[in-house]
Regions:
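Eukaryotic low-complexity, acidic/Ser/Thr/Pro-rich regulatory regions of large signaling scaffolds
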Residues: 421-424
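Beta-propeller-forming repeat regions
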Residues: 23-354, 358-367, 387-411, 415-418, ...
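Sec-dependent N-terminal signal peptides of Gram-positive bacterial secreted proteins and lipoproteins
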Residues: 3-29
Length: 446
């Protein structure tokens, strides 16, 4: 097995030549076997790596995070020349090692070996968090099934200096204080001793590592998604979507910002210790309309035309004081993977139902509510058309094609003159407000 790994390293190093200007190595297995011959300097690097393998090492690529290759390229020193970072495990003594090779006079030279312990290397990230022009290496070590430890290393004269670290379940790297450089947020699930915590790790220009933390909502069981984005007053923030038990719902979003020099959860309410205004049962937070601010979705039950319940989704944006305002409303059709941004004057006046009686057609009907007990006046249908007759079905009189995705065609038809019933709608509005869905908006998705 070791001999096979040594053979495969030759095309892998050729990949380094092909994409050395693009940052971290990303290459498919098929591409490994279709690369040109490599230069002598990469053959020398291969010899260095084979030497490590000959000592009983095995490749140990990170199991998570954005960079998951066993051999990676990254300009750590900021001189425009990529260093090579390679990840190994030594089963005999259980050591995990990260080797750094630098180009010197046309040859790769081993400049540093970072040694850690654990069952695996969970993740690696490279970013300049103190603004000195060089990138720190942030390595996550998988200590056990439930425990991970992060170590932050500065590269000084091509040697790694351990600055500090902390335990975590989920890591988020983003500019939280708005200084133009990334910060580290370590998120920890509840333990028997403490509740869930978000910890800010900030590296000062003088090399001092500063930490501050804030409570997350009581009742968290898993963290499903972490997003970095802006609040409506311009503050950068980290949005932590979690699943658990929060009274009236199973999903909550904690909104963490830097205030008065420390990390603060501005959405948390007392005495419950829960971000109550964000609790719901569906959907992750998102910049749903690509306007620049992250919104929190709160489902609202629509007046029913049948026993099947349907919801509109009200999307709320927050400011740095934790106050929210309604930004927009959508209707999401999860089964057919589309959503529609609803005009404000549809609020409280529109109901929906499904019509799936025609083969190859899945239809949602929007109706104006004449009175609380009905009747309903249909004014819009949106169809998802599939099967051999999809194109013909999309060309029926009155139907207007919105888009296509794979073998599916999405179309709509207006059933009443535009802007009837005092509602805002016409062909252009439906075209502009229709969107396809993506799975990461659903609860529990990454």
């Amino acid at each position: 097995m070791k001999q096979l790994k040594q053979i495969l390293i030759t095309p892998l190093l050729a990949a380094l030549v092909v994409i050395s200007m693009s940052g971290c190595l990303r290459i498919t297995a098929d591409e490994l076997y279709s690369l040109p011959q490599v230069s002598e300097q990469y053959r020398r690097l291969q010899q260095h790596i084979n030497s490590v393998l000959s000592q009983g090492a095995e490749y140990a690529p990170p199991t998570g995070g954005p960079n998951r290759q066993a051999v990676q390229l990254e300009d750590l020193s900021g001189d425009g020349i990529d260093e090579v970072v390679a990840f190994f495990a030594f089963p005999i003594d259980g050591a995990l090692k990260v080797y750094i090779f630098k180009m010197v006079d046309g040859d790769y030279v081993e400049t540093e070996v970072i040694t850690g312990t654990g069952s695996a290397i969970e993740s690696v990230r490279y970013t300049d968090i103190d603004g000195d022009g060089t990138k720190e290496i942030i390595i996550g070590w998988q200590m056990s099934a439930a425990l991970k430890h992060m170590s932050i290393y500065a590269i000084r004269d091509y040697h790694a200096v351990l600055l500090g670290g902390t335990e975590y379940n989920v890591l988020s790297i983003s500019d939280v204080d708005g200084d133009g450089f990334d910060d580290i947020i370590a998120l920890r699930l509840p333990s028997p001793e403490t509740g869930a915590v978000a910890e800010l790790v900030h590296l000062m220009p003088d090399g001092e590592l500063v930490k501050s933390d804030t409570r997350l909502s009581n009742g968290i069981e898993t963290i499903s998604r972490v997003s970095a984005g802006l609040l409506i007053d311009g503050f950068p923030a980290v949005f932590v979507d979690s699943e658990g038990r929060f009274g009236d719902g199973t999903i909550a979003t904690d909104i963490c910002v830097i205030k008065d020099g420390g990390l603060t959860n501005v959405s948390l309410k007392w005495p419950s210790g829960v971000s109550e205004d964000t609790v719901r049962n569906l959907y992750n937070s998102s910049d749903i309309n690509k306007e620049g601010t992250i919104k929190v979705p709160i489902p609202r039950l629509l007046q029913a035309q049948s026993e099947t319940p349907y919801h509109a989704i009200d999307w709320y944006a927050f400011n740095s004081s934790g106050h929210s305002r309604l930004e927009l409303t959508t209707f999401h059709n999860n089964n057919d993977e589309w959503f529609l941004i609803l005009p404000l004057d549809w609020r409280g006046t529109v109901s929906v139902r499904r019509e799936d009686t025609v083969s190859g057609e899945r239809t949602v009907v929007f109706s104006y509510i004449v009175s609380e007990d009905g009747p309903y006046r249909d004014f819009l249908k949106i169809h998802k058309l599939t099967g051999d007759m999809a194109k013909e079905q999309s060309m029926r009189p009155g139907r207007i094609v919105l888009t296509s995705e794979g073998a599916a065609i999405y179309a709509f038809e207006l059933l009443a003159p535009q802007n009837s019933f005092g509602l805002t709608f016409d062909e252009e509005l439906i075209k502009n407000n229709f969107r396809l869905m993506y799975s990461d908006w659903l609860s529990g998705a990454g």
